[in-house]
Amino acid sequence: MKNFGLLVVCLSLATLVIPSDGVHIDGDAAPFFVVSQIQHTAGNPAVVGSSYTGRTAVAPPLNMRTNVAVPSTLGINSVNIGTNLPTFYQPTPQPVRSFKNTIDPSLLYSLMAGGLRGDGFLNQLNTIEFSSPAEVIDAVENAVENRADAIKDVIETVSGAVQNGDDEVEGIYDVFAEDDSENPVENLDDSDGVYDVFADAMEKKAEALENAAEAAAEYISDQSEEVDDLSEEVLDDDSDENDSTSSESEVEDSDVDLEVDVGIDLGGDLDLGGGVDLGGGMGMGGALNMNGGLDMGGRYGR
């Protein structure tokens, strides 16, 4: 990761998204509103003001999602965190003068369960307190790295299945070859069924390749659904657009790169495009591009 220092400045424009009136019984259909700023009063806990009403939000102590919006120019658009927020209320909030103010843990003390989006492998934020912007940065950075590790693990699993098929075929040569000819199988007596054994090994290799392809296709499908789900949850709010526009002007030269060079080529049977490229970081709104590999570095188009 590089240029993460700029994220401290950019987080001054970050927003939080919480349900405005609780969570409906049917779960994900909960209404959301966008909060334009974190507010703070001297001697009082940090509170959140509604960008629609100007009033302070009251969050029921229910299981809900919090969205930390990071400027799109950094390649990390939004990080959804499963959370269990406490009920809070501050009747007279004042606009914050600078994000250098500490975020009071009374507001974000109960970020629990679920982890960052991609619940299957990004389950790292369990009971964590964010008391400063630096901790938010660390959490985002760790999530990006964990996501890269998870993708790498999937590719290694596919690669391992293919390698097992190769090892099995090579084992046939090792067991039955008793001379130095270039193709020892041709010199074996087929009366012992050696050719049948070899053919069986080739069939098993083909089966391993097929299974690997199916596993990769299933994983890619899951990732595509995850991106679609996130796209549906991101709100097209004017205040959010203003935040993104302002942040781009401040950090237009910034970049956050994380590349995982773990590509495999299965000899034409399955080609993952040379590897997994996270491009500009963790761009959860990006398209799933199988022509050039699994590219999660796109930006959500607002």
Swiss-Prot record:
Keyword Secreted annotated: yes
Tissue specificity field: Component of the acid-insoluble organic matrix of calcified layers of the shell (at protein level).
Signal peptide positions (record): 1-22
Cellular localisation: Secreted
Biased segments, Acidic residues type: 223-257
Principal location class: secreted
Gene Ontology cellular component annotations, sorted alphabetically: extracellular region
Glycan attachment points: N242
Coiled-coil regions listed: 198-234
Name of the protein: Coiled-coil domain-containing protein 2
Species for this entry: Lottia gigantea
